[in-house]
Amino acid sequence: LKIANSRGHLIILPWMGQMIWDAQFDGHGLTMCNMFRQPKPATEVIETYGCFAFHSGLLANGCPSAEDTHLLHGEMACAAMDEAWLELDGDMLRLNGRYEYVMGFGHHYLAQPTVVLHKSSTLFDIKMAVTNLASVDMPLQYMCHMNYAYIPNATFSQNIPDEILRLRESVPSHVNPTAQWLAFNQRIMQGEASLSTLSQPEFYDPEIVFFADKLDAYTDQPE
């Protein structure tokens, strides 16, 4: 499904996890370079890893270790949606969806993702609401996973302090680090290098990951 305004468009897969396949605004493609010419039928996101954004989780998240049994980035990424519909509300176009996960003797929840496109704007909203329908607590591990295009010399900014960003020190099993990548990570940990500007692409493959926790202690609305 392609939804558009005067500034650009989104291509969305309403029936597969409400994945956003592509995003283009003001003549700029926002999606990372990848090998996929089009979406592929998939049950795991790695089988169609060319999208701009997807909902990662919900019962489990991230890269499974040897001891884990969950799919890469969880069951929601490629979930077969039960319902999808469009709503027009003033200057907004909203794509809604519903997915009910139920497993005998297991978890039961309702996921309701939403994408909102605004009139004459390059900003759009990605939302997710989750309701536990079981009689017991459920684990919830959610991430809105964005795959942005690499922009040379782009800069990062945020309204949280730099010192709360923590570098991931573990190396997942699917990552094959190079010697220069390991050395660059060590320089970051020692305070000798930073990633405020994307000016050294040779050091960013594999990806470099930072964590931040308890953001509400610093701002009501992290940006």
Name every feature range the model reports, one short phrase each.
Residues 1-125, 136-139, 148-223:
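Surface-exposed acidic/polar loop and edge beta-strand patches at domain peripheries
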Residues 129-130:
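Hydrophobic beta-strand positions in extracellular immunoglobulin-like domains
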Residues 142-143:
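Structured soluble/peripheral alpha/beta segments that form catalytic or ligand/cofactor-binding pockets
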